[in-house]
């Protein structure tokens, strides 16, 4: 579903029927895999490339398209045409644009779950660029100290806006930062939907018995621009070619 919708949205963008679009093409396995492994009543805090969260949660496509086209029947009644919306009915919290702050919101939800002893887990998304914000440190530190049942999912897609990871941080992997917080951390193939699903499903069951935070780095690649108007001229073609061979849909079809 996400890929089909993405392709349609790119057509609508060229037709002038939507004003902008943040594409998640090539990264769909992460949002679909994570959401499929979560329970319907558990909160997820997605970001602007996680269309798969909304489709996997079962939101009617008519409402999604109304939202993206700025119609009154959308979730924000035409006030926003992107992913800055949530829905209590589907337990989705709307994204905060600079991404870091929503990690702290996830801590709050996880704390409520822990106090209520309801066994629910919270999943929150950010990008590798978002980990350079101070909110990332604060959220992970609090979650670690309080043993909050939250999974921090970092979609490492190679670029934060136009800045490559080599100019973002010195550690080899984002997951290595987990040690500094005394937190379990893993790096997985974000283009393999089965690996994403199995990892989240396994962690969920364990966290229900032993509440604690997890840092999960999903390796993937951004195949479009930060948003469609920016393009990808700053990305080496060999990188694009390499990751095109790792397309998550083709991976799953060949399984």
Regions found by a protein language model. Give the residues of each.
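Mature N-terminal segment immediately following signal peptide/propeptide cleavage
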Residues: 1
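Glycine-rich ThDP/TPP pyrophosphate-binding loop and its adjacent helix/strand module
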Residues: 92-255
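Cofactor-binding active-site loop characterized by glycine-rich and histidine/acidic residues
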Residues: 6-146, 164-170, 175, 180-182
């Amino acid at each position: 579903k996400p890929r089909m919708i993405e392709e349609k949205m790119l057509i609508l963008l060229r037709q002038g029927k939507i004003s902008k679009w943040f594409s998640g093409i090539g990264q769909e396995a992460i949002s679909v895999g994570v959401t499929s492994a979560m329970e319907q009543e558990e909160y997820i805090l997605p970001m602007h490339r996680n269309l798969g969260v909304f489709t996997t949660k079962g939101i009617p496509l008519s409402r999604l398209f109304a939202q993206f086209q700025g119609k009154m029947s959308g979730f924000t009644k035409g006030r926003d045409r992107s992913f800055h919306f949530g829905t209590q009915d589907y337990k989705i919290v709307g994204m905060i644009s600079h991404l870091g702050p929503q990690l702290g919101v996830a801590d709050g939800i996880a704390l409520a779950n822990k106090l209520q002893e309801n066994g629910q887990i919270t999943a929150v998304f950010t990008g590798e660029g978002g980990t350079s914000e101070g909110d990332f440190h604060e959220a992970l530190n609090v979650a670690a100290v309080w043993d909050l049942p939250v999974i921090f999912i970092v979609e490492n897609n190679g670029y934060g806006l136009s800045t490559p990871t080599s100019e973002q941080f010195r550690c080899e992997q984002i997951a290595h930062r987990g040690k500094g917080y005394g937190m379990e951390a893993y790096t997985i193939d974000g283009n393999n939907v089965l690996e994403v699903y199995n990892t989240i499903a396994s962690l969920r069951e364990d966290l229900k018995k032993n509440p604690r935070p997890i840092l999960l780095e999903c390796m993937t690649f951004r195949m479009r621009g930060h948003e469609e108007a920016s393009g990808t001229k700053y990305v080496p073609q060999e990188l694009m070619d390499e990751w095109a061979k790792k397309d998550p849909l083709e991976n799953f079809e060949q399984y």
